[in-house]
Design a protein with these regions (language model features):
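Intrinsically disordered, low-complexity regulatory regions
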Residues: 1-154
Length: 154
């Protein structure tokens, strides 16, 4: 499991680097996104991955790797938005955004390590296409919960 932690930290470093570069270029413009908009952005990325997996070809010169990076970053943005609520304008500094990014990346690592212990790294035997399908399924679930205004019966 030590390798898993290092691999996670490496992937998060790659994702954070892109997040930081986009913060430099655009600032925290994503602060205006409502939770449903973040959900839709993740859906768009996951749907593109599935389309590429199914068709086997892309017309835009970006592969699935960049889409998975975007899913990670939008996922963290979503967690930040759920904590703070959306804003009418970018209302934080780039540095504040990175502190929050790091907070949720750390929380995600801790959760992954706990689940990894319980599931004994079964995910390593999964196909990439299964990840895509699971992400899409969870997005559809999230959209349904959003449609119900968060009121679920279980």
């Amino acid at each position: 499991m030590k390798d898993t932690k290092q691999q996670f930290e490496h992937v998060i470093a790659v994702c954070r680097d892109l997040f930081s570069k986009k913060l430099h270029d655009y600032g925290p413009a994503w602060r205006i996104l409502r939770p449903s908009s973040v959900t839709d952005q993740i859906f768009i990325k996951a749907n593109r991955i599935r389309s590429i997996e199914t068709k086997g070809v892309t017309l835009v010169d970006e592969g699935i790797r960049s889409e998975f990076i975007a899913i990670v970053n939008y996922g963290i943005v979503g967690l930040i938005q759920l904590e703070l609520g959306y804003a009418e304008a970018a209302d934080m500094t780039n540095e504040e955004a990175l502190v929050l990014y790091d907070k949720y990346a750390k929380t995600s690592l801790e959760l992954m390590l706990a689940k990894n212990h319980d599931y004994d790294e079964a995910w390593r035997s999964m196909r990439i296409s299964s990840y895509t399908d699971l992400i899409l399924m969870k997005i559809y679930r999230t959209k349904q919960i959003e449609s119900l205004s968060g009121e679920i019966r279980w």
